[in-house]
Amino acid sequence: MLSSRLPKDLSPSPFFAELERTKAAVLAECAVADGRVGNAGRLPFIDMTVSSPLRVGLPVDLDAAVEDARKDFGCWNPDAAGWKSAREAVVEYYRERGGNFTAGQIILTASTSEAYSVLFKTFCDPGDVILTPMPGYPLLDTLAQLEHLECAPYFLSLKRENKKKIPACAGMTSGVDFRFILDTDSLLAAPEKAKILLLVSPHNPTGHCISREEWNAAVRFCEENDMILVVDEVFGDYGFSPEVRRSWEYVFGGKRDSRLRGNDCGRESLWDAGGGDFINLPEDGPKCPIFWLNGLSKAVGSPQLKLGWMAFYAPRERFEEIRAALEFVEDAYLSVSAPAQALGTALLKHSAAYESRVKGRLLQNWQTLREAFPSKYCPEVLGGWYAVVRLGEDDEELTLRLLKEKHVLVQPGFFFDFDEDGWVVISLLQEPALFKDAVARMRSLADS
């Protein structure tokens, strides 16, 4: 009766069922202890998997945005690509960061997940293959499966690097020597039916950010194999070093000081697509279409508002055909609501200030983690909201022991398809005092 798109078994795995039971028992124990006198030594529960800024004291000022946007909540002006005013707000978001997109290169979606779905529908047929990073976030496989697509891995490998070549993160020393890199040779094993290469930068969960050399290799691979390049950069605002680049800079050129001198991408440097529609498509740009995915979920910490977007580049001779195809798919759903577009327009004005608040938290927690664990066990994070730690025992046993003995919840590495045992994934969003406490407990377990 059910579609073959769905997994044959929808029940939780035995491990995750046990993890949920253990978590419930720990929470009950902590609740009882909180009500007793003389239990000051009891360890409180700390969630190191938290993924929403709303849960850790980092909300955006939504009330002010609502007042600004309320007048447009009842507006019904359907546009397959999204309201032009909202797309122009996204253009301004990029401009503040040195980007030169135009409104004609922006397509709004109800979420980043929906953006994937639109791209899969536009470019793939059932049975085609998406190349995804390993380790990587498991949602990507699910989204592909729901479109009758298959995933094949390419690899991020842990390498020891020359310390002098690794840029120091803000407020930190450059004494680290382990980091994840893109294994470009692993791309060569791609199946013939591969249609899309998916990069995630900053990567969840390793914190890898795509370098220029890695980018050039990925673009060359897509050009040679007539593939689409998709870059998930939902964590793009949260690079830890000034040396970390947004990958669209490799296509359009970066203007790092644009916040001070403004965007100088004049009309004379744009391509006239007709009808007064000017698009930034460099004549000497890549020969493959490229899409960058992002959204309010991370840009302003508002996953509840459900607004994402894709910014895209294509060779000039293919741009109009691709945009028409994307709008055809979008027009079938028109899933982006008026309130979401109105609020997004208002909130993106404050994205730079929000980015600064969150990045300060992330850097503080990353420093705490690196002081507790050497680079060999805690590889360099170049950006994002997560870090990985290798504690050297079975993932499942380690995760359960941390929860039972130390009341710290982490995610096991196998959930992200690490090819070796002993990895756990932790969020860098948690409140700094709680984060420091949790890291100390992790360290004590590792030393025991």
Where are the regions that the model predicts?
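N-terminal small-domain helix-loop-helix segment of the aminotransferase-like
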Residues: 9-111, 118, 335, 347-349, ...
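Hydrophobic residues in well-ordered beta-strands that form the structural core
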Residues: 132, 153, 231, 410-412
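Conserved core segment of the aminotransferase class I/II
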Residues: 250-252, 269-271, 280-360, 446
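Conserved glycine-rich beta-strand-loop-beta hairpin in the small C-terminal domain of fold type I
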Residues: 341, 345, 360-370, 377-391, ...
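Generic structural signal for small/hydrophobic residues in well-ordered secondary structure
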Residues: 48, 90, 106, 130, ...
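Conserved core of the PLP fold type I
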Residues: 74-164, 175-222, 236-245, 273-285, ...
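Intrinsic disorder/low-complexity segments
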Residues: 31-42, 152, 158-178, 246-273
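PLP-dependent enzyme catalytic core of the Aspartate aminotransferase-like
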Residues: 92, 100, 188, 401-409, ...
